[in-house]
């Protein structure tokens, strides 16, 4: 059975205990300005935490072809951020919204919310961190199925081009942390930029995918999406993860592991100070 490493257990415990500061502006936002993403963690066979990431379809209007967490806009103001994130994860990668439909023996635990971020489209985005793990009451001591093969089985070809995972702790490191041979190329680079008159650290991570099963959509006749088939190999050897997603990964890893990154970064978690100062523009969608 898969056992969490001590540092992975401690990371989950920190996230479970974390409480983000109050953010009253969220309640004043219309549904059209609200969004949420699912930062889904799970343990690999070595007990290390990995995080699920998608590549957005090239056909999407916003952020096409970029790496992102499963997530999207609110349907109504009655949806909680976690409900938004879980609904979008169902639509994008087939992760059931109903916990009772998660394949046994797995459960999804909502660990915490991270402080809000501001997308270039003016959406206020709430990251929801969750942990996919076996339910102790359903484990009989036998070998657990591989999460990559069991829990990410279906894609929506209209929204997702690929689903892959990345080593969570590595988002605090300037170089590849995985053991064994890795494909050529760097893991990290970064630069400072100006974002709404704020200095904002732009992180670029290049995630190796040569030793994992990357799930992609398969097209039925007529262009309709069918069951996705995992590919043992792909032309790419690294996927670029950057922008708001990269910033959220750094923030989440900092909180989880209680460590600071090996590279320069923004001290604040999220963009809540910026969002509060830009409230009128956000509400008027002038960003």
Where do the PLM segments sit?
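N-terminal leader/linker segments that precede catalytic domains of diphosphate-processing enzymes
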Residues: 1-160, 166-287
């Amino acid at each position: 059975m898969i056992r969490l490493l001590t540092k992975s257990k401690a990371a989950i415990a920190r996230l479970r205990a974390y409480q983000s500061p109050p953010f009253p502006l969220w309640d004043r936002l219309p549904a059209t300005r609200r969004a949420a993403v699912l930062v889904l963690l799970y343990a690999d066979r070595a007990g290390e935490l990995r995080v699920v990431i998608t590549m957005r379809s090239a056909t999407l209007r916003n952020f096409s072809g970029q790496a992102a967490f499963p997530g999207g806009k609110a349907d109504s103001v009655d949806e909680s951020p976690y409900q938004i994130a879980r609904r979008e994860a169902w639509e994008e990668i087939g992760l059931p919204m109903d916990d009772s439909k998660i394949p046994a023996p797995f459960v999804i635990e909502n660990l915490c919310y991270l402080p809000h971020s501001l997308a270039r489209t003016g959406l206020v985005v709430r990251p929801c961190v969750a942990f996919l793990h076996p339910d102790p009451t359903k484990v009989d001591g036998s070998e657990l199925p591989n999460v990559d093969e069991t829990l990410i089985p279906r894609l929506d070809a209209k929204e997702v081009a690929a689903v892959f995972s990345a080593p969570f702790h590595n988002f605090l490191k300037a170089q590849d942390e995985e053991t064994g041979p890795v494909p050529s190329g760097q893991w990290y680079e970064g630069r400072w930029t100006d974002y709404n008159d704020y200095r904002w650290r732009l992180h670029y991570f290049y995630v190796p995918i040569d030793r994992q099963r990357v799930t992609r959509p398969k097209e039925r006749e007529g262009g309709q999406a069918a069951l996705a088939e995992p590919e043992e190999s792909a032309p790419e050897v690294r996927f670029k993860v950057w922008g708001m997603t990269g910033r959220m990964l750094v923030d989440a890893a900092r909180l989880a592991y209680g460590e600071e990154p090996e590279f320069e970064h923004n001290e604040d978690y999220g963009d809540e100070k910026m969002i509060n100062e830009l409230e009128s523009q956000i509400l008027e969608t002038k960003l």
